[in-house]
Amino acid sequence: MLLRAVAAAAIALPSFFSLTSAFAQTDSERSPVILHAGRLLDVEGGRIISPGEVLVENGRIVEAGTSVAHPAGAHIMDLGDRTLMPGLIDVHVHLFLHPGAEDLQTVEESVPQRTILATLAARDDLMGGFTAERDMGTEGAGSADTAVRNAINQGLIPGPRLRVSGNAVDILGGHEDAIRFNPEQHVLSNATYANNVDQLIEVIREQFKEGADFIKIYETGHDTFRDGKFSTPYQYTEEQLATAVKEAARVGKKVGVHATGEPGTLYAAQAGVEAIDHADQLSDETMRLMREKNIPAVPTFTISEYFADHAASPAAGTRLHEQLAFHAAQFKKQLAAAVPMAVGSDVGPFPHGTQARELVLMVQYGMKPADVLKADLLNGARVLGWENQIGDLKPGYLADVIAVDGDPLQDITAVQKVAFVMKGGVVFKKAAQ
């Protein structure tokens, strides 16, 4: 019932009218399409091919290169002096959050209202060039993200391919347990409690029953940054996390974590989580394990920058900018230690559809554009469990293709200038001529 209500409400909005014609088409009804542009990104090779063409048929890429076969009846789309590249991937989003007081919106807005807003967020992310995402928790909206995912998959509303987690998992008094509110008001947690191994297993099974694709666990609590020193308490032991990872693996699924620093990040790496999100500070041992186990760090710089720029006071802004600079310095150490990276922005508290800023910041803080694009597209596809399906322009891959103004290898800000979006062979954003 919720799925039908959300889909109907979303499609009824005027801003969706221009997109509904795309939903009426099926893969089998579309003729072959040839995308032509001035350039094409070779992700694995870290180079630009010029000119670039992609042949799309039945929602998948048939061929890509400087020139492709032109089957009879194919529709040619000339995208001009732009770069064809795979759709962007964000492995850390919050579709159920929007700019404003995060704690208040989760209390004041009903789950149906937040779900409708989440459909708009999904649309905005897709229009921003993000064709696949990992939603890292509804922050108190339970499993409502499964309705959004399912509506997208059924072609009822526009949005990226989604991996969803439902409510994140947290301890009593932990990171999302309404600790800033008057305890006498008994404000509900934005996460689901699990305080021991037995509760972890029960919650994980319940989350999967409700449709979660993976489990999101808050491994670290409230961060402290004073006099240039960063600290954060762990919330689950390595044994508890390992149990969670094992239980998820039992049904072929994975565990993601919010983990900003030691020792929680070490416990997460030891347990074998799919990625370590935020990763403000990592020990040498943690970095070694991440490198050996191929566990990527997901720095989420954009949310830190946004909070610093929109702080409640000048003093708070100064402190948050100092903490961001600290994280940037730690990021350089992680790069030097060959820690794998993936790209996640933590979008939600800042406007959806603008999170390509994350790639820009990762270059600003030390990565080469080609390496950031590999982190986003190749490592991102692996984190989402869609490796060899998305993240590159190869025969057999899903036709998730965008076109950007400029050359992202020369100027990474090109990824913020998305002119064209195709997902699964369906055009959702047409380039202006």
Language model features with spans:
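Bacterial N-terminal signal peptides
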Residues: 4-21
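Histidine-rich, glycine-flanked metal-binding segment
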Residues: 27-31, 40, 45-85
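Metal-associated gating/positioning segment near the N- to mid-region
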Residues: 82-156, 172, 239, 271
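Histidine/acidic-residue-rich catalytic or RNA/ligand-binding cores of hydrolases
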Residues: 100-102, 145, 174, 225-228, ...
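Active-site mouth loops of central-metabolism enzymes
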Residues: 104-116, 179-202, 254-256
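Divalent metal-dependent hydrolysis catalytic cores, especially in the metallo-beta-lactamase
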Residues: 118-143, 158-168, 212-223, 254, ...
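Histidine/acidic residue-rich metal-binding segments in metalloenzymes
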Residues: 147, 197-297, 322-340
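His/Asp/Glu-enriched, well-ordered alpha-helical/loop segment
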Residues: 250, 323-408
